[in-house]
C-alpha cells in the first residue's frame, strides 16, 4: 500500500480552512492535532512516514495566523519531504567514534544511526527469502519510534552513546562480539563506549558518567516502546552476523 499523501493533505487543508473560517466568528479554532500515519505504511515508505511525522512537530494551530501558516506548510509538505529524503542520501552512515559523546556532533550522530539502521533493514529486506521473513515487519515497526527520535535528535544522550557504540562496532570487520557486548550494556542501563578506541576521550566519558549519576535501571525496562526497539537492535546484530558470514563464504 502506497502512502497517499495527496488525499491526506487534501483532507488536512480542508480541515484547517474550516478552522480559519470558524476563528473569524465566535468559535475558537480547533486544537486537535493531525496524527501522523505512523505504522500503516511502515513497510513501504518508512523514511517518508518518519519525515511526515517529524514535519508535524513544526505545525502550529493555536491562532488564525498560525492556521494560515499551517495551511501553507501543508500545501508544500510533499516537496519538503522529498528534499529531506534527498538530503539523507548525502550523509555518510559511517560512524566516527570521536563523535560519540560529543554535544556538538549529536545531531549528525543521530542521523547517522538512523540511516545506518535503514541500511541494515534494506539488506534484510533484500534477503527475506533466506532470512526470517516472519520477523522483518515486526522489527521495522518496533524500530519506528527510535527512528523518529533519531531523526528529531531527541534520543536521550546516554541511549544515543550506547546505540552509536553498538552500531559503530557493527560497522567494523569482525567486531560482532564487541557489538553484542555493547548491546548488553545498553540493555541493562550502562553506558556503552567504543571498546579499544582512544579517540573517545576520558573527559567525555567522565562528563556523561556524572550526568547519568547513579541511575542504573535497565533500559529495557523503561517502557514497552523502549523495550521493543532495544530487542529489535539485537535482531539487527544477529542479522548482520548472518549476512556477513554468508557473504564472506561466497567471496
UniProtKB/Swiss-Prot annotation:
Chief place where the protein resides: nucleus
An annotated GO BP: generation of catalytic spliceosome for second transesterification step
A Pfam short name: Prp18
Protein's cellular compartments: Nucleus
Superkingdom field: Eukaryota
Keyword terms of this UniProt record: mRNA processing, mRNA splicing, Nucleus, Spliceosome
GO cellular component terms given for this protein: U2-type post-spliceosomal complex; U4/U6 x U5 tri-snRNP complex; U5 snRNP
Record region (Disordered): 17-67
Function: Component of the U4/U5/U6 snRNP, binding principally to the u5 snRNP. It is not absolutely required for the second step of pre-mRNA splicing at low temperatures but is required at higher temperatures. It may stabilize a particular conformation of the U5 snRNP or orient the U5 snRNP within the U4/U5/U6 snRNP or within the spliceosome.
PANTHER family: PRE-MRNA SPLICING FACTOR-RELATED, PRE-MRNA-SPLICING FACTOR 18
Quaternary assembly: Homodimer. Component of the U4/U6-U5 tri-snRNP complex composed of the U4, U6 and U5 snRNAs and at least PRP3, PRP4, PRP6, PRP8, PRP18, PRP31, PRP38, SNU13, SNU23, SNU66, SNU114, SPP381, SMB1, SMD1, SMD2, SMD3, SMX2, SMX3, LSM2, LSM3, LSM4, LSM5, LSM6, LSM7, LSM8, BRR2 and DIB1.
Family indicated by similarity: Belongs to the PRP18 family.
Protein name, entry field: Pre-mRNA-splicing factor 18
Organism: Saccharomyces cerevisiae (strain ATCC 204508 / S288c)
Organism phylogeny: Eukaryota, Fungi, Dikarya, Ascomycota, Saccharomycotina
